């Protein structure tokens, strides 16, 4: 029998099932997998339940790729270099980025909070 699953469902499963926890919240942040860019799942015993899906183009992963490109690395292959260099940087442009570039809001509904 051939089974199909969604991209974020596979991410959540690969994080939850091998973990030592019987109950856990699983947060997935991706560039884009099918159309989801983020998702929240709750793992309880042997079951994963999706609670939230953030859709493309609202993606922290795509933003990370854009920054990777802006500093001169190749998208979809240079992100690890940016990640490796991150601890050596200074937050020189932090205020500019937060004030002028990003509008980050935490999107957690009452339903998600109650289930977790």
Where in the sequence are the language-model features?
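Short acidic/glycine-rich loops and adjacent helix/strand connectors
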Residues: 1-116
């Amino acid at each position: 029998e051939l089974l199909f699953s969604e991209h974020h469902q596979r991410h959540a499963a690969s994080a939850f099932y091998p973990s030592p926890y019987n109950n856990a919240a699983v947060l997935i942040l991706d560039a884009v997998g099918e159309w989801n860019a983020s998702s929240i799942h709750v793992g309880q015993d042997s079951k994963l339940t999706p609670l939230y899906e953030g859709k493309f183009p609202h993606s922290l992963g795509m933003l990370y790729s854009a920054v990777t490109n802006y500093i001169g690395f190749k998208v979809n292959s240079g992100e690890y270099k940016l990640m490796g260099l991150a601890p050596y940087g200074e937050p020189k442009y932090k205020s500019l980025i937060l004030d002028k570039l990003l509008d980050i809001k935490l999107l957690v509904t009452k339903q998600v909070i109650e289930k977790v």
